[in-house]
Amino acid sequence: MSTDYLTLNRTGDKMPIRGFGCWKIDTKDCEETVYQAIKTGYRLFDGACDYGNEVEVGRGINKAINEGLVKREDLFIVTKLWNTFHSKKHVRALFDRQLKDTGLEYFDLYLIHFPVPLQYVDPATVYPPGWYVGDAKSLQFEQSPIHECWAELEKIVDAGLARNIGVANFNCQAILDLLTYARIKPAVLQIELHPYLPQERLVKWVKEQGIQITAYSSFGPTSYVDLTESGKTYTSLLEHASVKSVADKHNVSTGQVLLRWALDREFAVIPKSVNAGRMKANLEILDIKLDAEDNKTLDSLKTNQRFNDPMTYGFGLPLFD
């Protein structure tokens, strides 16, 4: 890519292609990590209700703003609607809590986290609820169609509280259905993307609809070692011999190669690190030039292995089949 941003439909907002992911940042480290990330140069922060650290993310952001390091308009803040709040009765209440938790006046992008409407869980019972089922033995679904949920997101845009809305972990059919009734078109699709799982057909079709793409889990199984069997057993892309060969050729890290691979496909990326050196390195990817041989090497790693799959968490939900 020749630019450092993706232009979003409808608003024309510039979404940075190099972002910082807030998943799995411990609450005790989160405020300082986000603050340091802003000092390092990050301007997009990707969060979610489900990550359980929105209060701390907000503190880090507001600390940087209050110290004059950045202005709010310099930042692009993303968060997500969790599954248990899909009902039209609960969307706005969760959104308002997320704004309050982060101490912000608006979000730049608000995403539906999964196309999975689960039974409502009162925040007084547990928050964030995750894939909570209480005393039940399986997931409990809510009778809440996506079109009602999306209409509530559109109202949030109308109120000036979210500049853009989009979806995560949606397949082609779910997006196709959404496009038949959406008054405000989704600006972004966020999905798992890496050389093991390039999802070329979905990516091509989504781009043809004018929807931009954010890639998560750019390093493959790294974030899933403690969550799934495939996360434990699959070779880390950061340690893969083929990725190392490309990295050695360009005198960069394997992480930088994987992020550059994504940028070359016009995906925004949201890696996370609490290590200052890696945090800086993950930003320094614009000048890396992968050639045709490099891309052939990386493309050969395709296995279609997905790591963020509710089926592998024991929920019996074949979401991506």
From Swiss-Prot:
Binding site for substrate: H113
Keywords for this protein: NADP, Oxidoreductase
Presence of keyword Disulfide bond: no
Active site, renumbered: Y51
Enzyme Commission number(s) of this protein: 1.1.1.-
Pfam families for this protein: Aldo_ket_red
Pathway annotation from the record: Pheromone biosynthesis; trisporate biosynthesis
Domain of life of the native organism: Eukaryota
Site (Lowers pKa of active site Tyr): residue numbering on this chain: K80
Biological process according to GO: trisporic acid biosynthetic process
EC primary class: oxidoreductase
Gene3D superfamilies hit by this protein: NADP-dependent oxidoreductase domain
MF (Gene Ontology): oxidoreductase activity, acting on hydrogen as donor, NAD or NADP as acceptor
Family the UniProt entry places it in: Belongs to the aldo/keto reductase family.
Its biological purpose: Catalyzes the NADP-dependent oxidation of (+) mating-type specific precursor 4-dihydromethyl-trisporate to methyl-trisporate.
Stated name of the protein: 4-dihydromethyl-trisporate dehydrogenase
Lineage of the organism: Eukaryota, Fungi, Fungi incertae sedis, Mucoromycota, Mucoromycotina
